[in-house]
Design a protein with these regions (language model features):
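Non-heme Fe(II)-dependent double-stranded beta-helix
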Residues: 2-27, 34-130, 237
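Non-heme Fe(II)/2-oxoglutarate
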Residues: 2-3, 8, 59-60, 86, ...
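Generic beta-strand structural signal
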Residues: 98-105, 115-117, 137-143, 153, ...
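Short acidic/polar capping segments at secondary-structure boundaries
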Residues: 107-112, 123-124, 145-150, 161-164
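Short edge-strand/loop segments of extracellular domains
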Residues: 109-110, 158-165, 225-231
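Active-site glycine-rich loop that binds ribose-phosphate moieties when present
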Residues: 121-129, 143, 177-185
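Short, conserved beta-strand element in jelly-roll/cupin
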Residues: 128-150, 193-196, 224-228
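Double-stranded beta-helix
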Residues: 148-209
Length: 269
């Protein structure tokens, strides 16, 4: 969907745009906010990300889908990454004001030569025994660092699949909740073709898969996962130290990443 320049500059969607974004996520499982990040900003972040990715693979790009997490410092903690205001506004409207996330965040990369990935969900239904889908508990925000095209591996998604409850034992027992091609063929799919600087808000239960990158460019997008607050903080959450940057983070970012508050961590030790 197209967001007005005024909304982008103010970091706030108007009531009608927010209503449409919420409805789109609830009905289809995702919404794309096109070109809400400037080309200059995207270029700077992309260069830094690719430098880190190449460092992690020791300069030898694998022909696969993967990713990695950048160091939690400097521009990698830009508030437009860790707490994008438009994405946060949508998520809070869907999952409540008390959402939280974890650090480090990751990225989804289709390296040149990457193949077709299996069809899967990133998050299961909370109560798979129920015959209906509950409201979302996990949402991922993706930031496209390059133009997404069919040639470079724009992700394939199955709109509305987040509302389909899995009943097949082979799917329920699969650690990746993979679907067969035949089963997924019953639902329609689309490719997430979008310009660089677009922000995607996606229900993590939606079926999707990485697609081949037939170009010589690295097709990367940032991936930041957010959770509905309905239980205590999981003990297995990464204990990343961001005390050196805590004071530079926005009030909204500190709220979302409140479990990383250095004062609270010190009191728990």
């Amino acid at each position: 969907m197209v967001v007005s320049q005024g909304e982008t500059e103010q970091g706030e969607l108007n009531d009608e745009t927010l209503r449409l974004a919420m409805q789109t996520v609830k009905e289809t499982g995702y919404v794309v906010l096109e070109r809400v990040l400037s080309a200059t900003w995207v270029s700077e972040i992309r260069v830094a990300f690719e430098r880190e990715l190449l460092k992690q693979v020791e300069g030898k790009p694998p022909q696969t889908h993967g990713g990695g997490s950048p160091p939690m410092e400097g521009l990698f903690l830009d508030p437009l990454i860790i707490a994008h205001p438009l994405a946060v506004q949508i998520m809070e409207a869907i999952m409540g004001k008390d959402i939280y996330s974890y650090l480090p965040y990751g990225c989804n990369t289709a390296w040149p030569g990457s193949p077709v990935q299996w069809i899967h969900r990133d998050s299961e239904h909370l109560f798979p025994e129920l015959p209906y889908a509950l409201p979302p508990a996990t949402v991922v925000v993706n930031i496209a660092l390059v133009d997404f095209t069919e040639e470079n591996g724009a992700t394939e998604v199955w709109p509305g699949s987040h509302l389909v409850v899995d009943t097949d034992p082979e799917i329920l027992e699969d650690p990746y909740t993979r679907w067969s091609e035949a089963k997924a063929a019953r639902l329609g799919s689309v490719r997430t073709v979008m310009p660089a600087g677009s922000v995607v808000v996606r229900d993590m239960r939606m079926l999707h898969r990485g697609m081949p990158n037939h170009t010589d460019i690295i097709r990367s997008m940032i991936a930041v996962v957010y959770f509905r607050k309905f239980h205590r903080m999981p003990a297995e959450m990464p204990r990343t130290d961001v005390s050196h940057a805590w004071d530079t983070m926005s009030e909204k970012a500190r709220s979302i990443y409140r479990f990383y508050n250095p004062e609270k961590q010190d009191s728990e030790e």
